[in-house]
Regions:
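Short secondary-structure junctions
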Residues: 26-31, 84-88
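Vicinal oxygen chelate
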Residues: 74, 80-119
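Conserved active-site tyrosine of GNAT-family acetyltransferases
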Residues: 17-22, 77, 105
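Conserved short beta-strand elements that form part of the metal-binding/catalytic scaffold
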Residues: 28-61, 107-113
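Short beta-strand micro-motifs in enzyme catalytic cores
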Residues: 37, 61-63, 94-98
């Protein structure tokens, strides 16, 4: 395996979600079609898929996006309309994680982890 490449969130309104994620992550999509929107976030792909019917948002699989300032990133997501899922919490050493729900109910994880370095 080569490592994680893409995290996909299903949304009911692709246009509004594209606008929201553009503001939330500070990047514009590199691929924008009615069937898929893709963002390059620090070399990893965040994808948006339009919901094709009933979708259940579960908490059993999480992706955490790396940040340098967990509280600032958390506050920014909340100010853009995300809702609290788990407040920033120290999980050992200097590692801090938090999760929010986007306006479509998807769980977004953020992590400050100075011990993990990209290759």
């Amino acid at each position: 395996m080569l490592g994680l490449r893409t995290t996909i969130y299903k949304v009911s309104d692709l246009g509004k979600a594209t606008e929201w994620y553009t503001r939330a992550f500070g990047v514009k999509p590199y691929f924008n079609e009615p069937f898929y929107v893709g963002f390059n976030v620090g070399g990893y792909e965040l994808g948006l898929l339009p919901e094709g019917g009933e979708t259940t948002s579960a908490d059993n699989v999480l992706s955490y996006w790396g940040v340098t300032d967990i509280q600032k990133s958390y506050d920014t997501l909340i100010s853009l309309g995300a809702t609290e899922h788990e407040k920033p919490t120290n999980v050992g050493g200097e590692i801090v994680t938090a999760t929010v729900r986007d306006p479509w109910g998807n769980v977004i994880g953020i992590i400050f982890n100075p011990e993990f370095k990209l290759p």
